[in-house]
Amino acid sequence: SSSSAASDVYKRQLVERCHDSLIEVAGVVKAVSSLPEIVRVYEESGVKFIATSRISQMRAIREAGICKKPLMLIRIPMLSELPDVVELCDISLQSDIIVLRALNEEAKKQGKVHEVILMMDLGDLREGFWNEEDALDAALEIEHELKNLRLAGVGVNLSCYGSVLPTKRNMQGLVSLASDIEREIGRKLDYISGGASTSAYMAMNGTMPYRINLLRLGDIGLRGETDNFAPDFLETGVMTIKAEVIECRDKPSFPVGELGVNAFGEVGHYEDRGIRRRALVAMGRVDYGNCFDLIPRMEGIEVIGASSDHTILDVEAVKDKVHVGDVLEFGIKAYGPMAYLTSSDGVHMVFKGGKQNA
């Protein structure tokens, strides 16, 4: 299998349009395992931060020496990884006062001042302070007692777990909280971070409330679209998966025998369509996650299902016959396959476009 990266011109357009709305961008590279080629594209596009969720990726970026931008940790950290957080990251998202106190002690040990963004939960029910009073107390403690931390801003996560969409109402709620914190600490915050790629459409259409000035964007820059937004100035289809056909023959479309569960403990759903031409390609769920996130590029191919190492295709309607040894191409229609594909040892990656050629 192989994949190709987008030209940096598209990400630059995205960043510049955010800048037009007075919004900085943290370029999120976790979905492509912080590949150096992608990190370079984001850095050259003018992002404020390079962001990822895993310390191992942070270390790889630092050791590769490819990034001059500040690094942002976007998963709230484990207590056990705080030494690495202080060593490797310039700024991190935080939502727990116990962790903040321990982080302050670690920063003191390392002789650093570490910047933090306090996360608020506005309904998506993942990370974040639920009560405004708790957030205000944490902000005051950071400002006046935790001398090796600097409160850089507040933020929110939406759409990742609870499917809650960004709206003017919840964005304005975040701005109001930021204003309350600013009154308490007596200074302006640097950043009010209004979410991730699903918030981009508000920045593009002018509905983002004033003072939201940082978005954490990965998916939309990598795929050129999200589930709720497909701007015409971004190119889609920038990742191509190639896989070789290892079997092709006519078979029944409904399993024959007593049925149980599949290799993943799931009850399968099968439609009896009679005898159909089927092809297997040499990639499976360990390579990309959900097979129904794949988009066959050849007309007439339908994804039927997958096991760990095989993908099953219906090729009955393909005009030109599919043969063993053919290499078929697929696009993706979701975020998940990128994370799998770029971390799989079984996937060979090729980068085209922009300044990358490999």
Language-model features and meaning:
Residues 23-169, 176, 184-185:
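Active-site-proximal beta-alpha core segment in soluble small-molecule metabolic enzymes
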Residues 7, 30, 61, 118, ...:
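Conserved, mostly hydrophobic/aromatic
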Residues 9, 36, 161-164, 289, ...:
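Loop/helix-junction capping segments adjacent to catalytic residues or to phosphate/diphosphate-binding pockets
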Residues 171-358:
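Active-site anion/phosphate-binding pocket segments in diverse small-molecule metabolic enzymes
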Residues 2-10:
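Short, small-residue-biased leader/transition segments that mark boundaries at the very start
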